[in-house]
Amino acid sequence: MTFPSDTFTTGQVLTAAQMNGIGDDINNLWRLTFRAVTGTSDTLVLADSYNKLITYSNTGTTTITIPNSSSVAFTTGAIVNILKTGATGTISIIQGSGVTISSAGATATNPVITATAGAASIIKTGGDSFTVVGRIA
């Protein structure tokens, strides 16, 4: 994400072009990009935590691994959004080495998504701790 390179001063009257540039940058803060996963395994990367929706469509079980902070330096409060798009299959979210997951799922440390259009957010709550919320089993 980049913002206008112009430097503005107090009391300056901005041109329409300058205002439009600022508006475009602000709009881009809310625009999601997509990453589609069709395979059976995925390890989250830093870029996944910024305005991204990861879609999973495999008909079998897809395993998502949350890596520890020495591998991927997610900031506290980082959110990774995931969506199951396939009609069949399951998404299983697992802990990388040293990672702790909590959720309201049947197995709190290994939440799964089974429903079509089931979505969840993985939130880093500190250190190597993550909470998974959403439509999980």
Residues of each region from the PLM?
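Terminal beta-strand-rich extracellular "head" domains
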Residues: 96-116
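Short capping/connector residues at structural and topological boundaries
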Residues: 8, 13, 49-50, 71, ...
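Exposed extracellular interaction/assembly regions and N-terminal maturation sites
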Residues: 18-97, 124-137
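Short, intrinsically disordered N-terminal pre-domain segments
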Residues: 1-20, 133-137
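Short clusters of hydrophobic/aromatic residues that line enzyme substrate/ligand-binding pockets
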Residues: 3, 8, 64-66, 113
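Extracellular disulfide-bonded cysteine-rich modules/repeats
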Residues: 115-125
